[in-house]
Amino acid sequence: GLGDVYKRQAARGVKDFIMITLGTGVGSGIVINGQMVYGHDGFAGELGHVIVRRGNGRLCGCGRTGCLEAYTSATGVARTAREFLELRNDESTLRQLPIQEITSKDVYDAAVSGDKLSQEIFEYTGTILGEAFADFIAFSSPKMIVLFGGLAKSGELIMRPIREAMEKNLLAIYKGK
């Protein structure tokens, strides 16, 4: 599980951190004082299901609308691509693909190749993540947030907008740390 991963990976020796896996869904774990937080029923730390868009948010697999996972998982990125392609007229190499078959990997490949619309999709996704991370920091003050999963391997395409949105939305006491 996530707890086993951190012992061998980036957070070794760190007692307060959050792990986020950006895959088909959004997995997460919160570690405080070296202990994984489970809550009274074992379900604490479902950060993929915090609401990031109220009102007219996307339907999530959990049945609610507006969850982080609906926007920032691999399937969320593919959905953003479909929405951008349907609602906008921008040129994009993604238009050469059958719209319902577009994957987050297709968006990544296009973005790396210079496709502006695909780069905007990463900007949009990273901004949502960064805003959420600012909130996560406010409630647990982690020393770090460790990202895993396919989307995390997108490097600066995803990390730059995450950092910018997070820093912009942090409480003043956390800025620059």
In which residue ranges do the predicted regions lie?
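Short glycine-aspartate micro-motif
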Residues: 17-21, 27-29, 59-61
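Short beta-strand-to-turn element immediately C-terminal to the catalytic PLP-Schiff-base lysine
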Residues: 29-33, 37-39, 51-53
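Structural signature of FAD isoalloxazine-binding scaffolds in flavoprotein oxidoreductases
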Residues: 43-47
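Short, small-residue-biased leader/transition segments that mark boundaries at the very start
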Residues: 1-6
